[in-house]
Amino acid sequence: MVVLPSTALVEDRTVIDLTDRASQLRQHVPGRATVSVVVPTLNEVDNIVLVLPRIPWWVDEIVLVDGGSTDGTVAAALAVRPDLRVIIDETPGKGAALRAGWHHARGDIVVTIDADGSTDPAEIPAFIGPLLAGADMVKGSRFVHGAGSADIDLLRRAGNKALTRLVRMLYGGRFTDLCYGYNAFWRRVVPVFEAAGDGFEIETLMNVRALRHDLRVVEVASFEAERIHGQSNLRTFSDGWRVLRTILRERFRRPPEVELAPAMVRLTPATAERGWS
C-alpha cells in the first residue's frame, strides 16, 4: 500500500495555497465533528473529475483509494482536488479498497461514495444529520419514500428484495435496501466492520454487523443515478451468490468482541422517536 502526498502530482502553488487556506478554515472549530469522504477508484478517469467537484466544500478530507488504475485516474483527481489524500492499494475488490480508506480516514465521521457518479455527493448532509442526532450509522436506501434508482434492473431489484427479507428474518432490523454502497458512520465503529469481505458483499456485511452489534442505524432516502461513463464491474449472479453466502455464514459466526470508543453525541428523546433501527 502506498500513500501519496496530496501535492505529489500538482505544480500549481496557487491552487495548493487556496486549498490549504480552506482546510485551515474548516479546522479548530470547537465541538465540530470532522468529516472524511472515502472514494474507491479503479480506472474511473472520466467519472472522477465530475464527481469530486460535487463534494461539499466543508468536507474536511477526501480519501481516494485507487486499486492500480492505468488510465490516469489519480493524476486527473489530483488536478481537480489537489488536497486529496491518495492511497494506492491494489488488493482486488471494493471491500478491500473501502477498508483501506477507513483505516486512513482521520475524520470523526466517514462517508463512503462511489466514483462512477451513481451516488450524489450533494446528499452527504442528509447522511450527516442523523449521525449528529445520535445514530451510529446511516445507510442510503433506494426504496423508501423520496428515493429511487435509474440504474437497478428488475432482476437486481428482486434479488435485493429477497436478500433484504432474509436479513430481516435472520437478524431483525427494518432495512429496506441491503445492497447499496452509500453509507456514513462514526469512525469509532470501524472495528465492527473489521475483516469484512473484499468484494461487493462488504455493503451487506456492514449492515449485518451493525445489527449484530446493536448499532443505532438510520436509513435515509437516496437516489441512485446511472454511472456516467463506462461499464460496472458488478456481476448480478456471482455477486448475488457471494452476498447470500455472506448472510448465511455470518449467522453462524460468533460476532467479534468489540470495545467501541465513547460516542461524541447522545441519543435524545426527540431523536429517539424517529425510528432508529
What is each of the regions a protein language model found here?
Residues 1-31, 170-172, 195-277:
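Hydrophobic helical membrane-anchoring modules
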Residues 18-26, 42-57:
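Short, well-formed alpha-helical segments that are part of the catalytic scaffolds
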Residues 34-36, 61, 205:
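Cell-envelope/extracellular polymer assembly enzymes that use nucleotide-activated donors
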Residues 44-47, 69, 94, 120:
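Donor nucleotide-sugar binding loop of glycosyltransferases
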Residues 46-50, 71-80:
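Acidic helix N-cap motif at the loop->helix transition within catalytic regions
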Residues 60-63, 74-104:
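Conserved donor nucleotide-binding strand/loop of the catalytic core
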Residues 66-75, 117:
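A conserved acidic beta->alpha catalytic loop
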Residues 89-104, 112, 122-200, 227-246:
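Acceptor/aglycone-binding surface of glycosyltransferases and processive sugar-polymer synthases
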